[in-house]
């Protein structure tokens, strides 16, 4: 069973963001923040979040993601769960996970076969579904790392959102997002609530 439908919906909503338009390469990343600012009132900390979108054509792309989160207390557990929304155009190709204890020792490897799969609703006529993993570890702090790859085919109308801070009382050490597009293909994006958030945006072409 899924502990929090609200948490799942937040993960799903992140995918509902479209880009189209005018660039070759778009990079976004958080700037360095003092450790005391990161940990202040935090229940969890994103140690590193990395998203790389490789757009092969107007209809095909590969999204490679890596997420490392340290959970500081029980209130931060929701941030440690894994969710990946899929549909007839998006499919989860690769996945691996790892739980690391406070001493830096790997205590568990998580395989793709351990993920749960669920439809959004049996009453809806939709091909949408998602994979999830409910991460639990008895002592705090602990760290969980996920790496996964999603293939998008024949239905590419937008890309994932860049939301470094997904939960309240969550610190962010490092987060990056990069989109690479074929020559002649562009990308349009919109920034929301980035003022004062120490986020940089870089657009480049060719080998820049």
Describe each PLM feature range.
Residues 1-37:
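Bacterial Sec-dependent N-terminal signal peptides
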Residues 35-208:
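Beta-strand-rich, non-transmembrane domain signature
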């Amino acid at each position: 069973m899924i502990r929090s439908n609200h948490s799942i919906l937040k993960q799903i909503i992140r995918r509902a963001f479209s880009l189209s338009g005018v660039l070759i390469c778009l990079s976004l990343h958080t700037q360095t923040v003092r450790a005391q600012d990161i940990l202040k009132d935090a229940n969890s900390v994103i140690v590193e979040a990395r998203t790389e979108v490789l757009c092969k054509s107007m209809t095909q792309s590969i999204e490679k993601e890596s997420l490392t989160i340290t959970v500081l207390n029980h209130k931060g557990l929701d941030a440690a769960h894994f969710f990946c929304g899929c549909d007839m155009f998006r499919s989860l190709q690769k996945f691996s996970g790892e739980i690391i204890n406070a001493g830096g020792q790997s205590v568990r490897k998580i395989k793709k076969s351990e993920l749960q799969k669920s439809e959004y609703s049996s009453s809806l006529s939709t091909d949408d579904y998602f994979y999830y993993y409910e991460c639990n570890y008895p002592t705090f702090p602990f760290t969980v790392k996920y790496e996964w790859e999603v293939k998008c085919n024949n239905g590419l109308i937008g890309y994932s959102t860049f939301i470094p801070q997904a939960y309240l009382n969550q610190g962010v050490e490092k987060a990056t997002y990069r989109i690479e597009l074929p020559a002649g293909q562009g990308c349009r994006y919109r920034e929301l609530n980035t003022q004062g958030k120490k986020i940089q945006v870089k657009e480049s072409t060719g080998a820049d």
